[in-house]
Amino acid sequence: TPDYEHYDDNDMLDANTPVDKTSNTLRVPDILALVIFAVVFLVGVLGNALVVWVTAFEAKRTINAIWFLNLAVADFLSCLALPILFTSIVQHHHWPFGGAACRILPSLILLNMYASILLLATISADRFLLVFNPIWCQNFRGAGLAWIACAVAWGLALLLTIPSFLYRVVREEYFPPKVLCGVDHGHDKRRERAVAIVRLVLGFVWPLLTLTICYTFLLLRTWSRRATRSTKTLKVVVAVVASFFIFWLPYQVTGMMMSFLEPSSPTFLLLKKLDSLCISFAYINCCINPIIYVVAGQGFQGRLRKSLPSLLRNVLTEESVVRESKSFTRSTVDTMAQKT
């Protein structure tokens, strides 16, 4: 169910769908979206469920596990909602779940997707502070503050989702006969554009800037220390930032363009046909995070020697981060002692 859905007479005259709905023919973008949804569902549910299981036992004693637990929960819940999108696309975007479900289910999908983005930005900021302000982290960084930061991320994600919940409605069509579920701003283009701009800035630009700035400074700090200079660090940085940018950019750009275009324009109609594919592309980010941190954090031989839960526990817990923080703390203290 596209979040930037517009109702107009063009929806009622779709030449690709017969009146009796007997044809199983789907557009190529919809077929590609279904394939992506299927892969993301299988990988995302299993991968994030494993991460939740591993980090749930560690969250009481390690802050890093709190970050990844919340991130995995957001991605896991997003993946669980995929059969809903899958069913709607298979039925030529017919919505068989009713009006209440039209408001709640797509809004929950958006809530979890934006929570995933904001939590990823929070994790990046935390790693930045660990490296550049380790003394403050040792004095004030605790589980309570981590849970508060996660609550703020979830709260902001909820605010970003409210417009979708308020303006999402169902509409019955007759040629072909089907029910559509989408966002209807009542032809108020200013409100629609304002919602799109706020969502773009808070849900994409700001997290992207946070990721880019944090990992750029972390990369510079790492490369300035000759003992830790390696191409692996560069690959981790490129993977995290590039995956976020690549998978979310089409969804955000098409949504912004559709909010500024007239529903009858050829460009709008083309973007509307690609909307499901853009959503599925953004969904890849829900299953890619566990893969990035596991594959980038360990060598191939190490992955073969360890069981997957054990490997995830080593990657997602606090040990390596704490050691890095303590190392910088000792270095800072030694430097201060030499100056006095």
UniProtKB/Swiss-Prot annotation:
It comes from the Eukaryota. The chain crosses the membrane at residues 31-57, 63-86, 104-125, 147-167, 194-219, 236-258, 276-296. Residues 1-30, 87-103, 168-193, 259-275 are extracellular. Residues 14-23 are annotated as: Involved in C5a binding. The modification Sulfotyrosine is found at Y4, Y7. SUPFAM superfamilies: Family A G protein-coupled receptor-like (SSF81321). Residues 3-11 are annotated as: Required for CHIPS binding. Sulfation plays a critical role in the association of C5aR with C5a, but no significant role in the ability of the receptor to transduce a signal and mobilize calcium in response to a small peptide agonist. Sulfation at Tyr-7 is important for CHIPS binding. GO terms for biological process: chemotaxis; inflammatory response; mRNA transcription by RNA polymerase II; phospholipase C-activating G protein-coupled receptor signaling pathway; positive regulation of cytosolic calcium ion concentration; positive regulation of epithelial cell proliferation; positive regulation of ERK1 and ERK2 cascade. Disulfide bonds join C102-C181. Its main location: membrane. The modification Phosphoserine is found at S307, S310, S320, S325, S327, S331. It is found in: Cell membrane; Cytoplasmic vesicle. Residues 58-62, 126-146, 220-235, 297-340 are cytoplasmic. It is a multi-pass membrane protein. Keywords: Cell membrane, Chemotaxis, Cytoplasmic vesicle, Disulfide bond, G-protein coupled receptor, Membrane, Phosphoprotein, Receptor, Sulfation, Transducer, Transmembrane, Transmembrane helix. Receptor for the chemotactic and inflammatory peptide anaphylatoxin C5a. The ligand interacts with at least two sites on the receptor: a high-affinity site on the extracellular N-terminus, and a second site in the transmembrane region which activates downstream signaling events. Receptor activation stimulates chemotaxis, granule enzyme release, intracellular calcium release and superoxide anion production. Belongs to the G-protein coupled receptor 1 family. Homodimer. May also form higher-order oligomers. Interacts (when phosphorylated) with ARRB1 and ARRB2; the interaction is associated with internalization of C5aR. Interacts (via N-terminal domain) with S.aureus chemotaxis inhibitory protein (CHIPS); the interaction blocks the receptor and may thus inhibit the immune response. This is C5a anaphylatoxin chemotactic receptor 1. It comes from Pongo pygmaeus (Bornean orangutan).
